[in-house]
Swiss-Prot record:
Protein keywords: Membrane, Transmembrane, Transmembrane helix
Topology term for the membrane: Multi-pass membrane protein
Protein name: Uncharacterized transmembrane protein DDB_G0287341
GO CC annotation: membrane
Transmembrane segments: 10-30, 94-114, 134-154, 196-216
Subcellular location: Membrane
Biological source species: Dictyostelium discoideum (Social amoeba)
Domain of life where this protein originates: Eukaryota
Lineage, broadest ranks: Eukaryota, Amoebozoa, Evosea, Eumycetozoa, Dictyostelia
Positions of disulphide bridges: none
Length: 245
């Protein structure tokens, strides 16, 4: 019963973690938006920039009828620092996703009785050790990767500002209200801060942290029934061989 309870909890937790990472990839991570109340026309939302997994959208109008219009394709200066951070975010978040996928896939294989290295004399002990490492190591890796990614996204405003400094200097950039210094905030004209992708990743990171602790405390339960069966079969086979001899 303990093993079954652990399996259900395990697959529920990591199924949710996996799904949250998928939604993170599909959602915008950070945005800077012009306040609506300074416009007479209310039929659209204006985003100065919107950062997603595969692109950065600049000056985008979302109309009620679904039409989209872009009238600028860059910040007006090179964004090498921002692009470097974006690349790091993509790599780390993808590795976190692959780590979670690997864990789910590997445990499924384990439970459909596909044999790897367990056909040895010490298969029970070796198998349990391997799976304890997998069950603790994979979520721990995913947690650290997601945690680092969270802080990389926090660095997006600083990256934009630093790129502006390189092109125009601090005096000009500091006079531009858009090139703000905080991760989240607003002024007379702009609202800026994390979008729903960052919030999803934060929830995913917290959930992965607790899932890691759960696996660490209960990893032995995941294979206890299977290993008991393996040990029983192994002993029976040895007894049969001895009887034949």
């Amino acid at each position: 019963m303990n093993s079954l309870k652990f399996k259900l909890t395990f697959y529920t937790l990591f199924g949710l973690i996996w799904s949250l990472l998928v939604f993170f990839f599909l959602s915008p991570w950070y945005e800077e938006t012009l306040k609506k109340d300074i416009f007479e026309l209310k039929q659209y939302k204006f985003s100065n920039f919107l950062i997603l997994y595969d692109k950065i959208e600049y000056n985008k109008f979302d109309y009620v009828d679904g039409a989209e219009t872009y009238f600028r394709d860059a910040f007006g200066f090179e964004t090498k620092t921002l692009e470097g951070i974006m690349t790091s975010i993509k790599v780390l978040s993808t590795l976190a996703f692959l780590s979670t996928t690997f864990l789910i896939y590997f445990t499924i294989i384990f439970y459909v009785h596909i044999k790897f290295i367990f056909d040895t004399e010490n298969h029970r002990r070796l198998g349990k050790k391997v799976w304890c490492y997998v069950l603790i190591g994979s979520p721990l890796v995913s947690f650290f990767l997601s945690f680092i990614t969270l802080f990389l996204i926090i660095g997006i405003p600083s990256a934009v500002r630093n790129d502006c400094y390189k092109e125009y200097g601090k005096k000009f950039c500091n006079s531009q209200l858009r090139y703000h210094t905080s991760f989240i905030g607003e002024n007379q004209v702009w609202l800026w801060g994390p979008s729903r992708g960052w919030i999803i990743l934060m929830v995913d990171t917290i959930l992965t942290f607790f899932a890691t602790i759960y696996c660490w405390r209960n990893a032995h339960k995941f294979d206890e029934v299977k290993m008991k069966k393996k040990k029983k079969n192994y002993l029976n086979n040895n007894n049969n061989k001895n009887n034949i001899l």
